[in-house]
Amino acid sequence: MIQTQTRLAVADNSGAKELMCIKVLGGSGRKTANIGDVIVCSVKSATPGGVVKKGQVVKAVVVRTVSGVRRNDGSYIRFDENAAVVIKDDQSPRGTRIFGPVARELRDKDFMKIISLAPEVI
């Protein structure tokens, strides 16, 4: 579960290293986001020379959460960190590489480009 003020690692090579959630998109008064949800973030740290700069406000999709998600077969999938991928307005990723595993739930939310770039889909 990601809420406002939550800090997330960045799972792509867009240039950002750490994000802070400032808004959860989708519905009025929505408090939390889970895997596959789009959030608005502020870039808290970035690598020099990257596409994304520190202080910039970007959209991102959550790809890993510590709280995890329940699958229809009753199993739970959890990760060691909260991570997101920076996206453009057309839902395509800003970076050209994805680092670490991503959850299969992204396929249901139509983030096929992220699924195809990811080294492992769990």
Curated annotation (Swiss-Prot):
Organism domain of life: Bacteria
NCBIfam families linked to this entry: rplN_bact
What molecular function terms (GO) are annotated for this protein?
large ribosomal subunit rRNA binding; structural constituent of ribosome
InterPro entries registered for this protein in UniProt: Ribosomal_uL14, Ribosomal_uL14_bac-type, Ribosomal_uL14_CS, Ribosomal_uL14_sf
Q: What is this protein called?
A: Large ribosomal subunit protein uL14
Kindly state the subunit structure of this protein: Part of the 50S ribosomal subunit. Forms a cluster with proteins L3 and L19. In the 70S ribosome, L14 and L19 interact and together make contacts with the 16S rRNA in bridges B5 and B8.
State the gene name recorded for this protein.
rplN
Q: Which GO terms describe its biological process?
A: translation
* Stored Pfam families: Ribosomal_L14
Keyword tags:
Ribonucleoprotein, Ribosomal protein, RNA-binding, rRNA-binding
Q: What is the species listed in this Swiss-Prot or TrEMBL entry?
A: Brevibacillus brevis (strain 47 / JCM 6285 / NBRC 100599)
Q: Write out the function statement from the record.
A: Binds to 23S rRNA. Forms part of two intersubunit bridges in the 70S ribosome.
Name the protein family. Answer: Belongs to the universal ribosomal protein uL14 family.
**Cellular component, GO annotation:** cytosolic large ribosomal subunit
